[in-house]
Structures are given as structure tokens and as C-alpha cells.
Amino acid sequence: MKAKMDKRKRFLMWSILLIAMVQMPNLALSPSINQINTVVFPDKGLSTIQTVMQIPNLISPFITITMAWLISRGLVTKRVSIIGGLFLVAATGALALIFNTQFWHLILLSCCLGLGLSGYISTASSLIVDNFNEGERQMISGFQTSFINGGGIIMSLCGGLLGTLMWYGGYMMLLLALPVAIIALFAIPKIPRQRKTEDGKNIGSARLHSDVFMYGAFIFVFMLVYNVIGSNLSTHLSGMGNSAVSGYATAIQMCGGVVCGLFFGRLSRRIGDYTTVLSFLVIFIGMTLLSLFPNSMAVTCVAVFIAGMGMSLMLPQCMFSVSKVVTPRTSALATSITSCICPSFGGFFSAMVFTNITTKLFGPSTVMRYRFVSFVALACAVIVFAIVTYRKNRKKEEIPAA
């Protein structure tokens, strides 16, 4: 597939994959959550710290939808949005060197990070829809998730190590966005702001297909569950070492995503949307192991590796399925919903929902939190299986009628 691409498309593909590597900078920060909670700001509760760290997930949807609207109106190009976002993320890393002593500094950094991420996460994904054919999109979607997880490994490992030196050390990893922005300057074509037909009208319908919202709902619920793993690892492993240990565990979690992403294309061609069901099942298995063997680092590594595979099953499948029902006119908005708005809201509300619910039911135990959410993931797998099967059977019934 890659051999059929011309040089321009290959350069663009690699640029998109490099952008994917700086798509999860929060993983560079999560290893320090326990240190921030117990040492830096001990007067703040764990839920409060987790929520502030998830502010980017609250800001991103609103800024992303605004950028998608501006892009669809031809007021801003995708190139400007992506490059501007990358530079802002890099600037956030530099700001952390100055603003790192007050609690409002933590809020400020989270807001700046959210603004930067809003510029490129979904917009970069829409470049895949606009510039590649269906076979190429299926392949690149899997590779993109592998690079997201690969970047997450680098972020979590280095962020955990830097976090042992200073609580804001993880923010230094955001500076990696700077060289990526420079590469994007040359790789992303200066395409017309809005492609037109010969009679001057916009290409395609302006209405979003209903499937976009269904896959967006899948992603929202998935991230609501998936984020419980990373946001609680630091606390769960606090008895086994410092933030570096949490960083290693997070890196192993991302390894699961990398490995699974490499095989996503083949798996997707065989089972289609059932990969979304599988994503919830691996979360169930991983969290169950975490809750059953809380004192075993070896089992913890296996558990997070298995759970990490979930992201490389859910996200690329939903993105690929959405790419088949969008038009050039709706690609920016559709990818904003599925790659930023829904996962961001899921990530933001994750701590608010599950940390608060499980704390009231079982106390601060992360063991019981993982156990509770594992059964939520299992229930989600059953529901999604029913939805996918129903849709598949309905399509079979519609074929003869057509």
C-alpha cells in the first residue's frame, strides 16, 4: 500500500504520524499526580488534582468545534490550525519553567495545553480523510494509533523520570512538539481553504451522518472507562516506588497499544466494528488483574499491557468507519467529534464520575475502583456487541430491498 503513494503523500503520512506522537502529553504528567497531591499541594484532594489535570479534556471540545467551524467556513486553514497548536503546546512546556509554585499555575498550564491540543489532534486526523483512499486510511489509522501509543511511551517514561527531579518535570516533554511543528510546516500542503466543485459550490453535504454520533458515543464511554487506568496508576503503585515506577507502568500500557495498532488493519478487515467490543473486553481483563493482584508488579505490567491494547482497537476502528460516511465539507467537524470532543469529555468526566462514586462506595481504595470499573467495561462490551450485531443484521436485510 505504501509503495503506491507518491512522495508528497508519504511525507504527509509521516508528518501525521509524528504529530500523533505528541497527541498524549498528559501521560508525561500523570506519573507525578501522587507527588502533586501529597507533596506539592497536600491541601487539595486527589479528585481535585485529577480534575485539574484533565482540564485540557474540558477545553479541547469547545475550541475544537470552533476551529472546525472556522475551517468549514474557509476562515482558517487546517495547516494553520495544526502548526499553531503544536507551537502552543511547546510554549506550555516553556511556561512550566516559570509558573510552577502556585495551584493556579497548574490550572494555567492545563488551560494552555488544552488550547494547543485543540489545534491539531482532530485536524491532523481529518487530513487522513481528505488526502488518502480507503485502503490507505485503514492502514494509516492503525499506524496512527501505534504512534500515539509510541509517543505515550516516550512521554510516560521520560515524564516519570523528570518528575522525580521536579514535580513539573513532565511538562518539559511538551517541548517535543517544537520540532514536529517545524516538520509540519513543510509537510502539510497549502491546500485551498474549502474545496469547490466546478460550479463553485462546496463539495458534499453539510449534514453529518448519524453514524458519526454513534461512534462518538462509543469513544466517549470507552475513554470514560479507559482513563481510570492511567489516572489511578500513580496512587495504585505508590507503595512500590516513586513516580518513575508509575511512568514505567504507563509505558508498558502504551506498548500494548503499539503492538495492537500494528495489526489493526488485518483485524479490522476480518471482524469490522466488533473490534470496538474487543476493546472493552481487554479493559475488563486488565482491570480485573489489577484488582486481584495489587501487590505484584509483574501482574501489573501484564494487566496494563492488555488494557493498553484497547485504545488501538476502539479509536482507529471508529475513525475508519467515520471516514467512510463523511464528505470533504464535513470531515473537519466529524473528526473533531470522534477524535477530540468525545474522547476529551470522556477523559475529563472519568475522574469526576468513577473516583467520586467508588470513593463513596468503597473508600479511597484503587483496588475496588479498578474492580468496579472492570465490570462497567464488561457491561459496555455486552451493550456494544448488541448494537453492532443489530446494525449488521439490519444492513443484511436492506441489501435485498436495494
Give the positions of each predicted feature:
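Cytoplasmic helix-loop-helix junction between adjacent transmembrane helices
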Residues: 109-147
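Extracytoplasmic gate region of multi-pass secondary transporters
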Residues: 30, 211-258
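A late C-terminal transmembrane helix in Major Facilitator Superfamily
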Residues: 323-363
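Helix-to-loop junctions at the C-terminal end of transmembrane segments
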Residues: 62-77, 260-272, 358
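Intracellular juxtamembrane helix-capping segments at the cytosolic ends
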Residues: 119-132, 313-327
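Conserved MFS/SLC helix-loop-helix module at the cytosolic interface between two early adjacent transmembrane helices
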Residues: 62-103
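Symmetry-related core transmembrane helices of the 12-TM Major Facilitator Superfamily/SLC fold
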Residues: 170-186, 369-387
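Helix-loop-helix hairpin linking two adjacent transmembrane segments in secondary transporters
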Residues: 143-189
